[in-house]
Swiss-Prot record:
This is Uncharacterized WD repeat-containing protein C27B12.05. InterPro entries: Coatomer_complex_subunit, Crt10, WD40/YVTN_repeat-like_dom_sf, WD40_repeat_CS, WD40_repeat_dom_sf, WD40_rpt. It is found in: Cytoplasm; Nucleus. The keyword tRNA-binding does not apply. Its main location: cytoplasm. The lineage of its organism: Eukaryota, Fungi, Dikarya, Ascomycota, Taphrinomycotina. SMART domains: WD40.
């Protein structure tokens, strides 16, 4: 006899180990940034931001007793502060870094920093002693993304997204009058009405998704520089991430009650209220007055049912599509995580949402800092990792299935949230999150990854995640013998 897979069985295929690596003492960290930690994908380097400086650690040199290691390298601010350029968060500290990322561009890896006066620095990870390439977007820079086409996207408090071409062929594009790059150093995507904390490219590099404090998402065509679709929510957007359809794990379902799935519908075609036009209006707005994107709840809502260990994975499927989506993506607000499908033709369909997929903050005072502004995808684990500034972490297991309805195929996508317990280690707000292979630069047949976190008190925490190979035994999926 066979039965459907339970959530406990599905999540137990993940091995998770949380530990403190070390604590940085007597360091001055800054609130209200995007992410202040990044780990290399090709070398054992860990980059930790302290103000306008980056400390580089060799992970091989970190001892097991959690003692503070010596940095193997320092990246000092490559430009002097100017009285004519002020920071948005702290006017007297314009060079404080807001966000950092390690990105592969072609065969090389680069470490990228974005600061509060709009300067963006790009370092060669293999040659950190070289002077970085500097770009300037004139306003506080936040979102960073690099496309497979070697386009660097930078979102900022200018309410725009700037694009820079990193390809060696840029000079040729710049001289081609048929190219949008003809005589241009940067291309600009205009359309948001407030600051843009997050951007992401799709896997082909042809689309860019941006999320703004003005409560809107926009999908852009990078070739035509046009907005293909605009989608409104009730709350400011703090995180966005395109997800490759191949990153979803296919679940075979033995039985499913008719009517337990509903057709996905379009929402967000018009603003919920007038857009926020100024920073002061944003600070005075009462986002808690909204039921946090309640339009995506009800049949769309995924509950974490800790008290029901025998819950079936199939119960996490909520909606279906009649056609394969062109793209899938996740966006986050203060409390909610929403999975959406982009169908082309200016159509976005929310598929499933959740806002109880984090453990409670260690102290209620951290609740004011709650915003889910850190998202990383781990396709090899069929997972997305989300972190909130208030000190919580969750791992979303991506799932999909196909069925036949009235003789036609339907396509179903969802996620199973998995809380990662941090309260025994996280005693202050999170300032950054990064994901890389457990052993960077080496083959990874056992699918072992580490999630690196930095905390306001200076703690650096490692969360090792490994997927059991047993999950790939088809006898476990929808065919578990009783």
């Amino acid at each position: 006899m066979q039965r459907d897979l339970t959530v406990d069985e599905f999540l137990n295929y993940l091995y998770i180990n949380v530990k403190e690596l070390f604590t940085l003492k007597e360091k001055s960290f800054h609130f209200w940034r995007n992410s202040l930690i990044s780990c290399s994908k090709t070398k054992n380097f860990l980059f930790v931001v302290v103000g306008d400086e980056v400390l580089v650690y060799d992970l091989k040199e970190i001892s097991s007793d959690a003692s503070e290691p010596e940095p193997c390298f320092y990246l000092h601010c490559p430009h002097e502060a100017s009285s004519s350029r002020q920071g948005d968060i702290n006017q007297d500290m314009p060079n404080v870094i807001n966000n950092v990322r390690c990105e592969l561009i072609g065969d090389l890896e680069y470490f990228i920093t974005a600061n509060d006066c709009g300067k963006v620095a790009i370092y060669d990870v293999q040659k950190l002693n070289r002077e970085p390439i500097i770009y300037d977007v004139q306003h506080s820079a936040w979102g960073l993304a690099v496309s497979p086409l070697r386009i660097l996207g930078i979102s900022s408090n200018s309410h725009n997204v700037n694009l820079f071409h990193l390809s060696p062929e840029f000079k040729r594009f710049k001289e081609d009058y048929h190219s949008p790059w003809f005589r241009q150093e940067t291309l600009v995507l205009e359309g948001h009405e407030h600051n843009i904390p997050c951007i992401t490219f799709n896997s082909s590099g042809t689309l860019l998704l941006s999320g703004s404090i003005d409560r809107s998402l926009q999908i852009w065509d990078i070739t035509s520089l046009s907005c293909l679709c605009k989608f409104y929510t009730k709350l400011s957007i703090w995180g966005v991430k395109f997800i490759d359809k191949n990153a979803f794990y296919h679940i075979s379902i033995l039985k499913h009650k008719p009517g337990s799935l509903i057709p996905a519908q379009q929402f967000g075609q018009s603003p919920w209220k007038p857009p926020i036009m100024s920073s002061s209006a944003f600070l005075l707005s009462h986002e808690e007055d909204f039921d946090d994107d309640a339009v995506f709840e009800g049949e769309y809502y995924v509950h974490i049912q800790d008290e029901l260990p025998k819950t079936k994975v199939k119960n996490y499927f909520r909606t279906y599509l009649r056609q394969k989506p062109e793209e899938l993506f996740i966006f986050t607000t203060k409390f909610s995580i929403v999975l959406c499908a982009y169908m082309g033709n200016s159509q976005i369909f929310p598929l499933v949402s959740s806002k109880n997929c984090f453990e409670e903050p260690i102290t209620p005072r951290f609740q004011a800092l709650h915003r889910i502004n850190m998202i990383e995808c781990i396709p090899e684990l069929q997972s997305v990792v989300c972190a909130s500034q208030s000190g919580q972490l969750t791992l979303l297991r991506l799932i999909c299935t196909t069925k036949i309805l009235n003789g036609n195929p339907i396509y179903v996508y969802s996620f199973v949230p998995h809380k990662i317990r941090l309260t025994h280690l996280v005693d202050a707000p999170l300032l950054g999150m990064s994901v890389c292979p457990l052993y960077p630069g080496e083959e990874n047949p056992f699918k072992r990854f580490k999630i690196m976190l930095t905390v306001y008190t200076g703690k650096v925490i490692s969360v090792e995640v490994q997927l059991s190979e047993n999950l790939y035994d088809t006898s476990h999926i929808g065919n578990i013998p009783l």
